[in-house]
From Swiss-Prot:
Belongs to the universal ribosomal protein uL23 family. One of the early assembly proteins it binds 23S rRNA. One of the proteins that surrounds the polypeptide exit tunnel on the outside of the ribosome. Forms the main docking site for trigger factor binding to the ribosome. Part of the 50S ribosomal subunit. Contacts protein L29, and trigger factor when it is bound to the ribosome. It comes from the Bacteria. InterPro entries: Nucleotide-bd_a/b_plait_sf, Ribosomal_uL23-like, Ribosomal_uL23/eL15/eS24_sf. Keywords: Ribonucleoprotein, Ribosomal protein, RNA-binding, rRNA-binding. One of its GO terms (cellular component) is ribosome. GO terms for biological process: translation. It comes from Sulfurihydrogenibium sp. (strain YO3AOP1). PANTHER family: 60S RIBOSOMAL PROTEIN L23A. GO terms for molecular function: rRNA binding; structural constituent of ribosome. This is Large ribosomal subunit protein uL23. Gene3D superfamilies: 3.30.70.330.
Length: 97
């Protein structure tokens, strides 16, 4: 059985994710590939003590990666969840990490 900390792997702290956090009141996470939207919603509500409005998920495709001059491969695919919360002021993820 997956715990809430197995579902949410890490927050995504890109420039776009931080801007959306401030303006649209959303949180962005890397989540387990097999996690459903309801599992993600319950995990975020328990960890951050907030009410979740909606959860959007997407699969980030693998990108090519080089290992030195000759060998190359791919980074693995991962699942991203964008969670919209109902709190009045935005949650600062950078302080919590």
């Amino acid at each position: 059985m997956k715990t809430i900390y197995d579902i949410i792997i890490r927050p995504v702290l890109t420039e776009k994710a931080v801007k959306d956090n401030e303006k649209k009141n959303t949180l962005t996470f890397e989540v387990d590939m097999n996690a459903s939207k309801t599992e993600i919603k319950e995990a975020v509500e328990k960890i951050f003590n907030v009410k979740v409005k909606e959860v959007r998920t997407l699969i980030v495709k693998p990108k090519p990666k080089r290992f030195g001059f000759r060998s190359s491969g791919y980074k693995k695919a991962w699942k991203k969840a964008i969670v919209k919360v109902e709190s009045e002021k935005p949650i600062n993820i950078a302080e919590l990490v």
